[in-house]
Every structure is written in C-alpha cells, then in structure tokens.
Amino acid sequence: MPSYTLHYFNHRGRAEICRMLFAAAGVQYNDRRIESSEWGSMRSKMPCSMMPMLELDNKIQIPQSMAMARYLAREFGFHGKNNMDMARVDYISDSFYDILDDYMRMYHDKDGRMMFSRSKDMNSSSEKRMRYQETCRRIFPYLEKTLEMRNGGNQFFMGDQITMADMMCFCALENPLMEDQNILRSYPKLQALRNRVINHPKMSAYLQKRSRTEF
C-alpha cells in the first residue's frame, strides 16, 4: 500500500470526504494542514494551483477533490461493485458535491480562501446565495427519491454497506445544517441516513476525535 499525504487548509471543506474514507478504511495517512498565511507562497507548487491534493509515495499528485475521493473509495472498497453501481455512487456523490461547492463559494475570498464567520454571514453575495438555494431545491428531492429506491431508503444508498455516497451526504451538509437546521425537514430519509453515518462504528470514532474547525 502506498503512503498517503493529504494537502489542504485547516478546514473540513472539500477534503473531509477523503478523511472520512481513510477513517472508514482504517488507513493511516499524513493529514497536512496548511495555514492560510502559507498559501500564497505554496499555491504555484500545487497542481492547477489548487487544493486539496492527494500525494502518493511523495511523488504522484492527484488534484480535484472528487477524483481523489473516487480513487480512495475504489482502493478501500467504498465504491460500487460493478460499473452501474459505480455510476450510481458517482452521481449521488457529485450531486452532494454540487451543494457543498455552491455553499463554499458564498464564502470564498478572491484567492479562494474561506472567509466564513458567523458575524460575516451577510457578506456572502445574494447571487451566490440564490444559486446555492436553487441547487438545494433541485437536488434534495431527487436524492430523497434515489435513496428510497434501495430498501425503501432505510439503509444506505447502496443497501446495507456504507459507501462514499453516504459519507458525502454527511460531510457536504455539515455547515449548511449549522446555518439552517431545517434544510432537510422535508427529506426525512436523507436526515435518517445522516444519522446512520454518524452512528457507523468507524465514522463515530472518527467524528469524536477529529480536529474541530469552523468549516
């Protein structure tokens, strides 16, 4: 097995899905958290001048958070078991990522850094907030129905085994639910799924000991 280094800011953000996959698999990795003050001097050294970035054996670099997550999910057994199931895990995960991405863009500064603060919530542009809200309105009903397609939505998205898709349901909605506890009020299956992820033995252990960050 290769050695892994995950490069990202000291946030959950777009890297948390990878941290959850490492935790679910019980695989050790170097969680390299970069302070915002360091980013200016490091940016040009990163693929596409962006993070997160996953590094294997200190030589292979994988950018793009969902490409990283899919790689780890396949490596660790948290993806689909055949091509159709993999497509299902992918489109569910990418749908949750759309919500996460639109939410985070409300709080980006011009250099791509998060400027999230409870006292500055209203500084997010109305256009970006409207886009985020519309994304939620489009995607939540679809994901609720998609979850119900397997065992009435009473287990995980792929049945009785947790996958990347379920972890994305949890991590993509952490901060949105802090802002608005009612966003899943009309989607009880999704809310119950998040609780199953929280109570999954590996996830529960990880969530209790992980670093506490604002976003």
UniProtKB/Swiss-Prot annotation:
InterPro entries linked to this entry: Glutathione-S-Trfase_C-like, Glutathione-S-Trfase_C_sf, Glutathione_S-Trfase, Glutathione_S-Trfase_N, GST_C, GST_superfamily, S-crystallin, Thioredoxin-like_sf
Boundaries of every GST N-terminal domain copy: 2-80
UniProt keyword terms in alphabetical order: Eye lens protein
Entry keyword Coiled coil: no
SUPFAM superfamilies linked: GST C-terminal domain-like, Thioredoxin-like
Name of a matching Pfam family: GST_N
Source taxon at top rank: Eukaryota
Domain GST C-terminal, residue spans: 82-215
Tissue: Lens.
Protein name: S-crystallin 4
Species for this entry: Enteroctopus dofleini (North Pacific giant octopus)
